[in-house]
Design a protein with these regions (language model features):
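Short, charged/polar N-terminal "headpieces" of proteins
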Residues: 1-28
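A short linear-motif detector with a strong N-terminal bias
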Residues: 8-10, 81-85
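Active-site- and interface-proximal helix/loop "cap" or "latch" segments in soluble metabolic
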Residues: 22-83, 90-97
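Predominantly soluble domains enriched in secretory-pathway, periplasmic, or organellar proteins
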Residues: 100
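Short terminal or interdomain "cap/linker" segment that borders an active site or interface and mediates
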Residues: 106-110
Length: 110
């Protein structure tokens, strides 16, 4: 079974969908779909990740500059990769995610 996280980047009017599928060897296939040209390199480069990639931020390929390519520093696609993989391996509850919805970032009106 796969786990999918959808992101609506309202600040740039782009959408990202990340699907993680855990394989028998414990690695994850990653499928990234987006209408953003800047994410194409990221999607083509990040097809497979390991458990270490989702648990060790310092060595994770998810955030490596050569993998991120032209993406903006504030792009939520890498966070969606973490969330989809965490959900797929049971580190984030699918039931709670379905019940409560996604993690959101909102503008604070003062």
């Amino acid at each position: 079974m796969s786990s999918t996280i959808d992101v609506n980047m309202s600040i740039c009017d782009k959408k990202v969908s990340v699907t993680a599928t855990m394989k028998e060897d414990g690695t994850f296939d990653i499928d990234i779909q987006s209408d953003c040209d800047s994410i194409k390199h990221y999607a083509e480069t990040l097809k497979n990740i390991t458990m270490d990639d989702i648990t060790n931020f310092e060595t994770s390929r998810i955030n490596k500059e050569e993998v991120r390519g032209n993406m903006s520093m504030i792009c939520m696609a890498p966070i969606a990769v973490y969330q989809a993989a965490w959900m797929e391996c049971g580190m984030m509850s699918k039931r709670i995610y379905t019940k409560c919805g996604p993690i959101t970032i909102t503008d604070r009106k003062e």
